[in-house]
């Protein structure tokens, strides 16, 4: 099933009982930037994939989904 990077990250946060700020700290970005990425307004940094995999101990299926979501987000970012 296809999900966007924003939905993937939000689901991951909820599963770990975190707020946007908590994930932003782990990713070493501001909450505002993380929000922009989640909403498709900014592209995710290339290093996020490995940081998220390590910080959240993703399953193999989650790693595949994350990779696909990040690639899709890099290709489809909307600028307003």
Label for each model-derived stretch:
Residues 16-35, 66:
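Short alpha-helical DNA-recognition segment
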Residues 1-15:
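A short, Lys/Arg-rich alpha-helix, primarily the initiator
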Residues 62-80:
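Short, charged recognition helix plus adjacent turn
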Residues 47-65:
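DNA major-groove recognition helix of helix-turn-helix/homeodomain DNA-binding modules
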Residues 10, 21, 50:
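Residues within the helices of the helix-turn-helix
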Residues 28-44, 51:
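Recognition helix of helix-turn-helix/homeodomain-like DNA-binding domains
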Residues 7, 11, 25, 36:
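DNA-binding alpha-helical recognition surfaces that contact promoter or target DNA
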Residues 13, 24, 53:
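The alpha-helix within a helix-turn-helix
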């Amino acid at each position: 099933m296809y999900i966007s990077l924003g939905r993937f990250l939000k689901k991951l946060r909820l599963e770990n009982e975190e707020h946007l700020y908590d994930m932003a700290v782990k990713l070493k970005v501001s909450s505002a930037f993380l929000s922009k990425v989640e909403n498709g307004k900014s592209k995710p940094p290339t290093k996020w994939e490995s940081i998220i995999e390590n910080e959240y101990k993703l399953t193999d299926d989650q790693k595949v989904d994350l990779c696909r979501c990040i690639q899709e987000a890099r290709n489809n970012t909307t600028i307003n």
